Amino acid sequence: MIGYVAGRSWLHRAHPYTPLALAAAVLLLSFAFHTPVPVWLMVAAALIMALATGTIREVLGPALLLATPTWLVLLVLHGLLGEPPKAPFGPFLLSEPGVARALVLGGRIGAIVIAFLAALATVSPARLVDGMTARGIPFGPIFLLVSTLTFLPRTRERAARILEAQQARGLRIGGSPLARFRALVPLVLPLVLGALAEVDEQVLALETRGATSGVRRTPLDPPADPAGQRVLRLGLVVVVVVAWAARLTNRI
Amino acid sequence: MKLRDLVVIRLGVIINLVIGQVVAALLLPLFLDAVGTILVAALVGPWAAITVGLVSQVLNAVLSGNFSWLPFGVIQVIIALYAWLAARVGAFRRPWTAAPAGLVLGVIAGSTAAPIAYHLFGGATAGGVMAVTTALRAVGMPLELAVRISSVSTDMLDKTVAFVMVSLILRALPNQLRARFPAHA
């Protein structure tokens, strides 16, 4: 959908945890608020984040693509088919409480999608790995996040090759739903069994690279994490905790 | 966690993410986004399967850009624990024992997903479920009930097929390969 977009903004140069913390704060605050105005302020905050990183053009298209179908369904489910009282809006009669609820739910989704797409656009995966390694994060979590993303395209290619090979052998992937269900087995079985057979080989390859040594690794060029950014992240935690405390005590 | 478990967990995550591609090519009304979680639960154990489920949920969000679905991660934990228990009682030995076990998981997972879908997303979630919800609401059903019915019915079908699929995979494992997974052997 969207990956890292090279740039020189403050968030591009920041420690990778900082843009991720900003996006996580938008997510948690969006769920803490339950009226349209503060939720749409979160959308504005996410848009400002994308603008500040210079990735607004890359972020806005995918964000609209992801959020628009949900917004339309929310409008139908809560606006058109919502509870009375209803008010005329052009040729339609829309539920007033339904529209308010759709605005809250739609705003949350918009804010979360924009904030995380902006964070993904500014966080270089390599810098994130260096940042995690420098913080002493064990090999396991780093391996799972990074290696899986590296392996995924290869497995997708293999799935496409198996599909072509089975079709060449006469497998029909069209027809009735039952026929398509039957086609699932000859496609999934070779893919999974082939991958399971390679597990030992991959374990051996990782062992020879010292993955099990248990020694803390040292990145060559770890990203700097100035005190200001650490304070900012701590501040975000405080804001989220205060917002949720206010929400749980019905003060917002 | 052992290195071998890590490699199997990675495999489980990849299966979760790639089978969706096969399902889309076949135009099936399913997600099948937990086959890897169920398989790892049967082959390795509950903690590995929970890790597969949660990492899949995060990576799915990273790849699609839609992080608003992260709260559904709790469903992956339920799937992992249930699949491990099902494996312990031998539910995967035959497809016809796996199918009813999958059906029950569908009811549990769908019932758990429905309140999340209703309260956090107002019923507007993913493709097939969303279409069923809208259709039921259009014929006058209350939204909360429409979300519950659509969520449970789609999950029952999805998890039944996923359990049968994992049963077929485990039955097709060559003995040499099976012996390398003590939890399954």
Predicted regions and their residues:
Chain B
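Hydrophobic transmembrane alpha-helices
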Residues: 1-43, 47-58, 68
